[in-house]
Amino acid sequence: WDGDGIKDLLLATNMHHMIPDTIRGIPWSRPKPLRGATLLFLRNAGTEADPVFEFPKQLKYKGELVRFGHHGCGASTGMIGKITDGLPNVVVGDERGSIYLLEREHLSW
């Protein structure tokens, strides 16, 4: 997903997710104002045959942490919408049935 030709993981969570700390490895939950279903990116630093996934990083859209409701969200990638760098955008569905297009050019982690 990051464009290096090796498959990565993009995971959707619920509001009560636990994200491992990138330094200590101990899972932690976001403080209440920042809670919400979110998207995590796990870059494959290995190979297709022997994947090694880095610690999950929470996606940001236009510099803000991505949050979708309480109960959960689902995500997929696709070549839809405005494609600026040849890499897929992200489509997210939330608990209310809303669908969001997150353009790749505005995503960071």
Tell where the protein language model's regions lie, with residue ranges.
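Beta-propeller-forming repeat regions
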Residues: 1-109
